Amino acid sequence: MRKLTALFVASTLALGAANLAHAADTTTAAPADAKPMMHHKGKFGPHQDMMFKDLNLTDAQKQQIREIMKGQRDQMKRPPLEERRAMHDIITSDTFDKVKAEAQIAKMEEQRKANMLAHMETQNKIYNILTPEQKKQFNANFEKRLTERPAAKGKMPATAE
């Protein structure tokens, strides 16, 4: 049994090292003019960049958007430590307290509602700094995104039958 375990560990390490060597050979540096990948933070956030794609914003508009987003960021708060601990306590308790969990969820829903309201207000402020032509393009982009169905993450594309 010891030999089998040793063989397994040795082969795992060897394959892991081979994968690392292969990964090091195939990595390429990003082009100098490439846009950084936008996960959750960036110029305007994950979806704001798409929201303003092809609008040809002026520098003044970009600055106004930055200021609006900075104000929004200051308002958006992470759930308080007590709420996160309360949620953790519910999850890790020996028995599930449904009443306590529902009360915690209600609290979290209130906070989410307030955050969504602030988010929509921010988007409205940004929309209202656009020129009429930019608003027209913005609405066209919105309609285009509604009709284009994005591929489901992590799922295989449907095969044609």
UniProtKB/Swiss-Prot annotation:
Q: Which GO terms describe its cellular component?
A: outer membrane-bounded periplasmic space
Q: Where is the composition biased (Basic and acidic residues)?
A: 142-151
Coarse class of the protein's main subcellular location: periplasm
Keywords (alphabetical) are: Chaperone, Periplasm, Signal, Stress response
Region Disordered, annotated ranges: 140-161
State the Gene3D superfamilies in the record. Answer: 1.20.120.1490
| Localization annotation | Periplasm
Q: Tell me, what is one Gene Ontology molecular-function annotation carried by this entry?
A: unfolded protein binding
Q: Which Pfam families match?
A: LTXXQ (PF07813)
Cleavable signal peptide: 1-23
Tell me the subunit arrangement.
Homodimer.
Name the family: Belongs to the CpxP/Spy family.
Let me see what the UniProt entry remarks about domains.
Has an elongated cradle shape.
Give the function comment from the record. An ATP-independent periplasmic chaperone, decreases protein aggregation and helps protein refolding. Binds substrate over a large region.
| Name of the protein this chain belongs to | Periplasmic chaperone Spy
Q: What species is this protein from?
A: Escherichia coli (strain B / BL21-DE3)
Classification of source organism: Bacteria, Pseudomonadati, Pseudomonadota, Gammaproteobacteria, Enterobacterales
